[in-house]
C-alpha cells in the first residue's frame, strides 16, 4: 500500500531541496526521520514535516507500522518564482528571484 504526501509552494530553492531529497531516497521511514532530524540543512525541516505527514496518511488509511514503511519515490519540482526588485547605484536595479518548489514523497510497505 502506498502513501503519498505533497508539499507545494515551499519557500526553498529546488536545488537546495534536492540536496536533501537525494540523501533520503530509498531509506526506511524511521531511519529517514532520524537522519532528517539531525541534518544541518534548512531543507531537512521541510522534508521531516512532509515525511511525518506521509506516515500519518498511511496510518489513517490502514493500520501500518511506520518502521515497516520505505521511501519509494521522492522528487522536487520547480514552483513559481516571485520576482523582487533591488535598487542599485546610478538608477539601476537588480531582480531578486525568490524560488519555490513542490516536494513529493511516496511511502510503501517493505516486503
Model region roles, listed by residue range:
Residues 1-23, 27-111:
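Structured, basic alpha/beta domains of bacterial-type, RNA-associated proteins
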Amino acid at each position: 500500500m502506498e502513501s503519498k504526501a505533497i508539499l507545494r509552494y515551499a519557500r526553498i530553492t529546488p536545488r537546495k531541496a534536492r540536496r536533501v531529497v537525494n540523501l533520503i531516497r530509498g531509506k526506511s521511514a524511521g531511519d529517514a526521520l532520524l537522519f532528517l532530524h539531525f541534518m544541518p540543512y534548512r531543507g531537512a525541516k521541510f522534508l521531516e514535516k512532509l515525511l511525518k505527514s506521509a506516515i500519518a496518511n498511511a496510518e489513517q488509511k490502514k493500520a501500518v507500522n511506520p518502521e515497516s514503511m520505505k521511501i519509494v519515490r521522492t522528487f522536487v519540482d520547480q514552483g513559481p518564482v516571485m520576482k523582487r526588485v533591488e535598487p542599485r547605484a546610478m538608477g539601476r536595479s537588480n531582480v531578486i528571484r525568490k524560488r519555490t518548489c513542490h516536494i513529493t514523497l511516496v511511502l510503501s510497505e517493505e516486503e
